[in-house]
Amino acid sequence: VKSLFRRAFIIGRRFRIVHVVHGRGRDHEVIEVSTFRAYLEADQADQVAGNEKTSKSDLVGKTHVVDASGRVLRDNVWGPQIEDAARRDFTINALYYDPVTQVVVDYHHGLKDLKKQTLRMIGDPATRYREDPVRLLRVVRFAAKLGFTIEPATKKPMAEAARLLDNIPQSRLFDEMIKLLQTGHALASVAELRKQGLTQLFPLLAPLMAEPGTPPSKRTQQIQFIESALADTDKRVAEDRSVAPSYMLACLMWHDVRERWQAAIEKGAHAVPALQEAIDAVFDARVGDISGRGKLAAD
């Protein structure tokens, strides 16, 4: 692919894809090109004792690896389109458009589910969640963003499978939280997390995980502030305006920052350095090195 296009760049180490740049300036478009991958049975994979956090050295030179819980850590094997479709999570994500024949290839009745506005997992849902627990969050994100109904068999294992997210690196969970809040349906995403019983995944969202229907008089100023910020974020996305992760983090942590800041001022600290110290302390306590300060600072 790279040899066909002048402005093409190979991306990735584990599984390489090609980014082809079309157009120039602000109007340029990046087209992602990847190869179909084979569907591999978990019982045919090499198994490592730990997880992705503890087994990096065990992954060297291997193409198909699962951890002790059954999560797929690596599956870099080329395959035909029909097997690539079987690897997808939802039926609506396994649709292939052939630009030559102008035909949509549908191996798993995705068009039918699309018309019925249904999220259905391909294969056995419990197994698919074990392969990649982050699929739980994709279910929530798609349901909130599209307004689709989660098919009963897809929904049934979700609460039990949530414990598998303990093995996911915090950096990836942080990124998934940001994705939920940047969909343009942040409030709906929070409601869906609550609806599916996934209330303990993101401590930063804990203030919003109260029971639905709480009277306005009992909704704290902190909750109202965060909900207002997320509503504003949803509005910005709807207007095709940018949303900075640093802004969302600031809104989520502002209540704690303000309390610490005011306490420092009451003890005689100067306002500006006290504010910076409060921000640093709350960031370290609530976020730590999850995403890296540089990434957020550049935002």
Predicted regions and their residues:
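Catalytic cores of the polymerase beta-like nucleotidyltransferase superfamily
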Residues: 1-299
